[in-house]
Amino acid sequence: MSSNIAVVGDRDTVTGFRLGGVREGYVVETPDEAEETIRNLIRDGFSIIIVTEKIGDELREFIEETTSSSALPMIIEIPDKTGPSERETDPLRDLIKRVIGVEMVK
């Protein structure tokens, strides 16, 4: 493995990150395909996995189970080309609070 960062998402998101220098990018079409890809990345030792918010919403329970017991891997959710989704909570804010134990922004 040449990188500790991978991106999982739609073709446009993955292409954008590859152009930005992220070597490991995986285009997925279904939630099952996304979950299998993320499981493989975790098994391969990736410490940061970037996914689109759509994937995050579809795999919420799996992501929370995966990230609740340790700081790594970090699964970071980003908007796709359609823009940010409306949410009551911010997964990135929750991750920061869990990792450092303090809420940074109120």
Swiss-Prot record:
Topology in the lipid bilayer: Peripheral membrane protein
Chief site of localization: membrane
InterPro entries found in the cross-reference section: ATPase_V1-cplx_f_g_su, ATPase_V1-cplx_fsu_bac/arc, ATPase_V1_fsu_sf
Signal peptide segment: none
Zinc found in the keyword field: no
Compartments (UniProt record): Cell membrane
GO cellular component: plasma membrane
Alphabetical UniProt keywords: ATP synthesis, Cell membrane, Hydrogen ion transport, Ion transport, Membrane, Transport
GO process annotations (BP): proton motive force-driven plasma membrane ATP synthesis
Pfam families linked to this entry: ATP-synt_F
SUPFAM superfamilies associated with the record: AtpF-like (SSF159468)
Top-rank lineage group of the source organism: Archaea
Keyword Cell membrane assigned: yes
GO molecular function, a single term: proton-transporting ATPase activity, rotational mechanism
Similarity comment: family membership: Belongs to the V-ATPase F subunit family.
PANTHER family according to UniProt: V-TYPE PROTON ATPASE SUBUNIT F, VACUOLAR ATP SYNTHASE SUBUNIT F
Subunit structure: Has multiple subunits with at least A(3), B(3), C, D, E, F, H, I and proteolipid K(x).
Function summary: Component of the A-type ATP synthase that produces ATP from ADP in the presence of a proton gradient across the membrane.
NCBIfam families listed in its UniProt record: PRK03957.1
Protein name, as recorded: A-type ATP synthase subunit F
Organism annotation: Methanothermobacter thermautotrophicus (strain ATCC 29096 / DSM 1053 / JCM 10044 / NBRC 100330 / Delta H) (Methanobacterium thermoautotrophicum)
Taxonomic path: Archaea, Methanobacteriati, Methanobacteriota, Methanomada group, Methanobacteria
